[in-house]
Amino acid sequence: MRNIVIPLTALFLNAMAVSAQSVSNVFGFPSTEPGYSLGVSACYAGQIGDYLVMAGGCNFPTPGNKTYYAGIYAARVDATVLNWQLVGLLPEPAAYGATVANGDSLLFIGGNNAEHSLKSVYSIHLNASGDKAEVQRLAHLPCTIDNMAAAMSGNNIYLSGGNQDGKPSANVLHHNMVDGKGQWYIAATVPGSPRVQPVSAATDGNVYVWGGFYVNGENSEVHTDGYCLNTTTGAWTALAAPRSVNGKQTTLSGGIAWTEGKRVFATGGVNKDIFLDAISGRYEFVKKEDYLLQPIEWYKFSGNLYTFDVKGNKWLKTKFADKALARAGAVVVPTEIGTYYIGGELKPSVRTPQIVIVKE
């Protein structure tokens, strides 16, 4: 990915001054692999010690030519400039998986590429100088899985929805990292129809899932609501959809969520009506052949920053939105200096190399 300087005025047109929440631009993006500098979506990313790590992802260097990447990159955490270097390679190019932290390592879970979906789990560790990644293959998942959401509560990993063994699913896979058995199993199923590209978060033994879509012809769905799984009792509780700064119910499909204390934050995602019109095959808003040709603003990706109060079990009033957050397929890495919001797409097939820090 090349380093692109974007005028700050373009980033903050929608910022709401009444909120303490903010977004600030960070310069620097990986550029070693040809085409990567254009920006990628659906990459793996996390923090190891003082370093940000990102890997894989995909983009369209030329129209219609979707490319997947295998590079593993690291950069020392910094609020203004990230100096990325290639520190290793994935065993194969991959995107649309998930990342969770595991001590001084990261786990890259599932995903897919142009050839197949993956059931692999890799442990990524950096050496002391942060210039070499060690990649270790762990026990396989029980099925291939991609476009799912991952959440972690204590030593427990939960993978919700996505495509499992090539089919849209609502299953929740569970793995305990310290039980010594190394087994994954289906712990629960989110009520209702499958959810591809949902968001998820976990805290205090509860797993939260919102959004996601299901392609099924005229019966296709773009979910706005969510559910909370009590992992002790196995019971599900229905959750309301988030609402924009304008009070409109929105979807988190294609967005991202993360936890901070007793709150869940979420941002990004597609516009429900426009996306549903396309995946259902109706194309009432625009002709099918013109769908990918519209300007970025037409797709109305969400730039809202949502806050869910775990204790009150409700969304707080949304007070902040920014065009820099209006993406799908971006990833987040929470750190002590803020949450890095990395890459993603601005519209179908158009990626961004922009990284910002979100202050909640």
How would you label these PLM feature ranges?
Residues Q21-E360:
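Kelch-like beta-propeller repeat domains
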Residues M1-V23:
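Bacterial Sec-dependent N-terminal signal peptides
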